[in-house]
C-alpha cells in the first residue's frame, strides 16, 4: 500500500469518526435535548481522552517544552491533519492553534450549519480536556466559532502540583 493510500485511509477514518459523533449527537438530541446530549457525549469523550493521558503524564506538572514535543510531534500525518501552530511555549503555558480539523471539515462537507458544527466542535474538544487534565495539566480550549478561521486553540498550563 502506498503512502498516499495510507494517508487517504487516515483522513477517511477521521471523517468517519466525525460522522459517528454527528449521528450520535443527532439521536441523543432528539431524545434528550441539546444540552443533555452535549453533556453526555462530552463526558464520554472526556473519558476517552483521559484513557490516553499516560503518555503525557511524565511531563506533568510543568515540563511544557517536553509536552509540546510529544504532543505536536505525535500529531497524525506529521501534523498536516491539524496544521498546528505553536503560539506559545514557555514556563507559563503551551498554546497550540489548529488551523485545520478533519472533524470540522467533515461536518462542513455534508452541509451542516456552522452553528451546529460549532456545537459538535465543543463536544469533540472534550477529548483534549480529558487528555491534558488526566495527565496532570490545567487546560481549556477555545473551539470553533462560526465565521472564524481554523478550529481549536488549545491552552495548557502547569498542573496543580506546580504551584
What are these regions (language model features)?
Residues 1-122, 130, 138-152, 157-163:
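N-terminal accessory segment detector
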Amino acid at each position: 500500500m502506498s503512502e498516499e493510500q495510507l494517508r487517504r485511509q487516515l483522513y477517511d477514518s477521521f471523517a468517519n469518526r466525525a460522522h459517528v459523533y454527528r449521528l450520535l449527537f443527532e439521536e441523543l438530541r432528539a431524545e434528550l435535548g441539546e444540552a443533555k446530549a452535549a453533556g453526555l457525549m462530552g463526558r464520554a469523550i472526556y473519558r476517552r481522552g483521559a484513557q490516553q493521558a499516560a503518555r503525557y503524564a511524565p511531563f506533568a506538572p510543568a515540563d511544557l517544552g517536553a509536552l509540546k514535543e510529544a504532543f505536536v510531534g505525535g500529531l497524525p500525518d506529521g501534523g498536516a491533519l491539524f496544521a498546528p501552530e505553536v503560539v506559545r511555549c514557555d514556563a507559563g503555558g503551551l498554546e497550540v492553534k489548529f488551523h485545520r480539523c478533519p472533524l470540522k471539515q467533515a461536518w462542513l462537507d455534508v452541509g451542516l450549519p456552522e452553528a451546529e458544527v460549532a456545537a459538535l466542535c465543543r463536544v469533540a474538544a472534550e477529548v483534549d480536556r480529558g487528555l491534558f487534565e488526566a495527565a496532570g495539566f490545567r487546560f481549556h480550549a477555545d473551539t470553533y466559532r462560526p465565521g472564524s478561521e481554523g478550529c481549536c486553540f488549545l491552552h495548557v498550563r502547569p498542573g496543580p502540583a506546580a504551584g
